[in-house]
Amino acid sequence: MSQTEVVRRALIREARPEDDAAIGELLVEAFISQYAKKMPEVIYTDERKRALRDVASKRAVASVLVAEVDGEVAGTVALFPPGAPDSQAWMPNAADLRHLATAVRYHGQGLSRPLLDATEALARKWAVDAVALHVRKGNAGVARMYMQRGYARAPEGDLVLPTVSLEAYLLRLVD
């Protein structure tokens, strides 16, 4: 299936409880396989895998979207509203974009584009000032993808945690 065909056939919709297991496995597979290739020093603990698989908790506080292709969950993203528990947005009235991933078999086929389009449209519907996100330090390809969409580096939102350093990016929706 061509990239254009995959994107054309993708249905972007709100995740449902019956999607939770598929989303959780997709996140674990996508993050581990991609980081294992691009950043071999990254190690995912069992605790991190459990957190990625806990989609029900995310749906309770955030809008979780999926890209469905031929009845299969092929991609996902979560958008946390301002002030939501677990939000990592560092500025007021900003939504927090997290967990953008596509199934490994769909990598490089453009599925992130419609997922991000839908997420950014939802943020505008919420009337937030910006969409905030974090990228693992050193993940230049992912950072470049966001910058090509208009996200700008925002060092004031960087997070340095015991197990990871994250660089902040911001898409301003209002001037």
Language-model regions, residue ranges each:
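Short acidic N-proximal helix/loop "leader" segments that mark the beginning
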Residues: 1-6
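Acetyl-CoA-dependent GNAT
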Residues: 10, 14-20, 24-104, 116-118, ...
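A generic structural signal for short
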Residues: 43, 107-108, 130-131
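Solvent-exposed, flexible loop/coil residues
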Residues: 47-48, 110, 163
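Conserved glycine-rich acetyl-CoA-binding loop
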Residues: 99-117, 124-126, 137-144, 148-149
